[in-house]
Curated annotation (Swiss-Prot):
Identification of the protein by name: Dihydroxyacetone phosphate acyltransferase
UniProt similarity note: Belongs to the GPAT/DAPAT family.
PANTHER family reported in the protein's UniProt record: DIHYDROXYACETONE PHOSPHATE ACYLTRANSFERASE, GLYCEROL-3-PHOSPHATE ACYLTRANSFERASE
Keyword Membrane: yes
Naturally occurring in which organism (per UniProt): Mus musculus (Mouse)
Entry-linked SMART domains: PlsC (SM00563)
Amino acid sequence: MDVPSSSSSRFSVGSASPSSVLLYAKDLKKWDEFEDLLEERRHISDFKFAMKCYTPPLYRGITPCKPGDIKSIVLSSEEINYVIKQLSRESLTGVDVLREEASEILEEMSHKLRIGAIRFFAFVLSKIFKQIFSKVCVNEEGIQKLQRAVQEHPVVLLPSHRSYIDFLMLSFILYSYDLPVPVIAAGMDFLGMRVVSELLRMSGAFFMRRTFGGNKLYWAVFSEYVKTMLRCGYAPVEFFLEGTRSRAAKTLTPKFGLLNIVMEPFFKREVFDTYFVPISISYDKILEESLYAYEILGVPKPKESTTGLLKARRILSENFGSIHVYFGDPVSLRSLAAGRLNRNTYNLVPRCIPQKQPEDVQAFVTEVAYKMQLLQIENLALSPWLLVVTILLQNQLSMDFDALVEKTLWLKGVTQVFGGFLLWPDNKLPEEVVQSSILLHSNLASLVKDQVVLKMNSGSSQVVNGLVPEHIALLMCSAYRNQLLNIFARPSLVALALHMTPGLRKEDVFSCFSFLRNVFSDEFIFLPGNTLRDFEEGCYLLCKAEAMQMAGKDIILTDKGTAVLQFLTSLFKPFVESYQLLCRYLLHEEDYFGEKEYLVAARKFTRQLLDQGSSQCYDALSSELQKNALAAFVRLGVVEKKKVDSKYVYYVNGPATSKLEEMLGCKKPIGKPATAKL
């Protein structure tokens, strides 16, 4: 068993306002004990495991059917027939032609779930996981709750997404516990992997195009296919809210398409309820860490192919530490909607007629998506390496070993006070914990003569697209640091606001916090419309860490809080500086541009500053950060987005760009938000 440690540090609550304490004073969470799935696998034949008696519990309202039956149900559904007739009238295309096209679409996307393929993957994955992972740890209580949930109502699994193996890992875990293997929404990229794509189909994967390009028939067939599986209770439906893997290891803002689809049967009263299960998958060491660094530096992602998969066999000789998979409590969609949503509008027209979602429903779907992601973040397990690398990145990339251990222990205490789920082995000395973390990540750090140094060659001397290995190594390290930012976001933004605000009046600090939260709302997960509560949570956590106190309408900083506030400000410094740097790029380089041109030119501009030594902000090289900044610039009016000849073009608003750059640099005061109420 692997049990997360309880906090050894004790911080008093300080003097946060009673409302803040009421809202955010959470009981110390009693984390479930984790079971290592691989422990039993190491003592029992993999073949015996794969061929075990597999009798998963079934949904009580299940409609028994085979994969082929689902396709027949979809093609004969009232909704598909209605859409085909509508399109036939609009395009003057024969109904039979459109029906054949719908059948081809179904053939392209549909799964062919078979127990034989599941057993094959169970055998192969058991061997691979034992080879590359020390442990695969799962919270048993979460599994027990899921076991009950799949029998009561349709279930939607919502895992975090950090690696290609996320969905394989989940299917392996569910098979191990005799739970129904899910049907999984996968990208069309995998279809290039011939034999592998067929195996994935037979293990439950169904394939969707990245964009539907306004293809009404494709959208109708795809959505009806997913809804049919959900209504029939065929199997749990699994997809990633983020839509794609996060290359920078921060949770990406949610995509709403699939979520809309799986919620619709409830909206139309076709099912009584639907359970959402947020799942948090945490890796000690990410398999694709170097690949991600190259991708966010502009190197194209390798095309998925069987040949590429075979070349990836080299990872079988590496150690990737442990994986922790936390199954959150099933969340009832009916409970979320109670008193929040009026479903009567769906009764006014026949179910088969597609409807445009009312604004209140759109807002509700958005709220549910962000809430599920916040639950994922809450249950992500944090390894000691995240603390170690964060300290090193703030200390000139090298430190005395004893000083590093001391600072890591300090950060451990702060992390636990902020509610981080930290996996720190209590049966080891701190020095051993830090040393074993460095050893696991020996491609990024080394211990030489009592000095810990981050390696700046990342095991490669290759220069790609003019990028030097140092940038690759730094971005690999940043990806681990970024995992801490999920739980540090709110107190860090308050700390930044305190640093940027002249005087410490609560109202002024809140205004600055609101501005920063708006600027960085594409970088981190914030529930829309929750600004005041986020501010109160950040203040409460800083009071809890004894970094500050509330005194009426003022904030008082404590002597003990200097280290905490300096650390938090430094933690977010790369994002503030990157956005400033990108503002300068817009002012000096471009009047208008397309997104692809922007990414290439912004990276070139940043690289020149790094080469000249006039900036050390290597985070600005990241395409993920550049895309997030562009989305923020559009929202803030720094650039205007227009569609020209079916392509989007961005026009720079010079004065607004200058103003934002000055506000981030504390050269211009931040105005009060119109809706600020404290």
